[in-house]
Regions:
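N-terminal topogenic module of multi-pass integral membrane proteins
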Residues: 1-120, 241-247
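C-terminal transmembrane helix-loop-helix hairpin of multi-pass membrane proteins
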Residues: 2-34, 180, 184-186, 195-247
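Hydrophobic, membrane-inserted alpha-helices
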Residues: 21-29, 77-83, 137-146, 163-170, ...
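C-terminal ends of transmembrane helices
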Residues: 49-65, 113-126, 166-180, 227-239
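Hydrophobic alpha-helical transmembrane segments in multi-pass integral membrane proteins
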Residues: 81-91, 141-153, 193-208
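Internal transmembrane alpha-helix with an interfacial aromatic "cap," most often the third helix
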Residues: 85-95, 105-150, 165-175
Length: 247
C-alpha cells in the first residue's frame, strides 16, 4: 500500500515538473520574439526542443521527424505570430497611432495557447484530439506562412505550404490502417500548394485582432480538411458515405 502511495506521489511530482517545464519553455519562446528583432532565436529554440527526434538510432530519425512535424509547425507558427504582433505594433508606433490592442497582451495570449498545446492537447491520443492537432497545426502554419510571405521567393513559399499540408494530412491519416498514407498526404500537399499559389497572387485577410491577420486560405483549408476527414472516416467504416455521417 505504501508503495502505491509513493508511486502516486512520484507521478504527481513528475506531472507537476512537466507542466512547469512546458510553461517556462512556452514563455521563453514567446519572450525571444519580444527581446529580439529577428524571428530566428525563437525558431531555433523550438527546433532544439525536438532533440529527442535524434535520440534514437539513425534508422528511426525519419519516422520520428515526420511524427514530430505537426508539433514543430504549430510551435514555429505561434512564435512567428508573436513576432509578427511585435512588428505590427512597431509600425503603429512609427506612424504615431495608438495600438487598438496592446501587443504584449496578444503575445502573452499566444504563450498561454502554446502552453495549453504542450500540456493538454499534444499528449492526447484520441481520434478527436489527433484530428484537432492536425487541423490546428495546419491552420497556425498557414497563418504564420502568410505573415512572413512578403519578400519570400514563391518557390520557398509553395514548398513550405506543401510541408504544412503534408504533415497535417499524414498525422490525421495515421489513426487508420492506411497503406497509402504517404501517397494521400502527398496528394493533399499538392492540392494545398496549388491553392497557395492562387492565394499568393490574390490574398484576402480577416482580422482576428488588429495585430493578427487570418488569411482566407487558412479558413478554406480548415473547412475542406474537416469535410475530407469525415468522408474518409465514413468510407473506412463501411465503404459508403451518407449525409448523416458528414453531419
Amino acid at each position: 500500500m505504501e508503495f502505491i502511495k509513493l508511486a502516486r506521489r512520484r507521478g504527481v511530482v513528475a506531472d507537476l515538473i512537466h507542466v512547469i517545464f512546458n510553461v517556462i519553455f512556452a514563455g521563453a519562446a514567446i519572450y525571444l520574439t519580444i527581446a529580439f528583432e529577428s524571428l530566428w532565436p525563437a525558431v531555433v529554440l523550438v527546433i532544439l526542443s525536438k532533440w529527442r527526434v535524434l535520440a534514437v538510432r539513425p534508422r528511426y530519425w525519419r519516422a520520428n521527424f515526420l511524427s514530430s512535424l505537426p508539433d514543430l509547425i504549430f510551435g514555429i507558427g505561434l512564435v512567428t505570430m508573436s513576432w509578427g504582433c511585435g512588428r505590427i505594433g512597431v509600425s503603429y508606433l512609427v506612424a504615431g497611432e495608438a495600438l487598438p490592442v496592446p501587443a504584449l497582451a496578444v503575445q502573452i495570449s499566444l504563450g498561454v495557447i502554446y502552453s495549453l498545446w504542450l500540456i493538454v492537447i499534444k499528449p492526447r491520443h484520441g481520434e478527436a484530439m489527433i484530428g484537432f492537432q492536425a487541423l490546428a497545426s495546419q491552420f497556425v502554419g498557414v497563418v504564420a506562412l502568410f505573415l512572413v510571405a512578403q519578400g519570400m521567393p514563391l518557390t520557398v513559399f509553395l514548398v513550405i505550404a506543401f510541408i504544412i499540408a503534408f504533415a497535417s494530412a499524414r498525422q490525421a491519416l495515421g489513426m487508420f490502417e492506411e497503406k497509402s498514407q504517404g501517397l494521400l498526404a502527398t496528394i493533399w500537399g499538392l492540392l494545398v500548394m496549388e491553392l497557395a499559389f492562387v492565394s499568393w497572387h490574390w490574398s484576402v485577410f480577416y482580422l482576428a485582432t488588429p495585430l493578427i491577420r487570418i488569411p482566407q486560405l487558412a479558413i478554406i483549408l480548415s473547412l475542406i480538411s474537416v469535410t475530407a476527414f469525415r468522408v474518409y472516416r465514413a468510407w473506412q467504416d463501411d465503404r459508403r458515405v451518407t449525409w448523416d455521417e458528414l453531419g
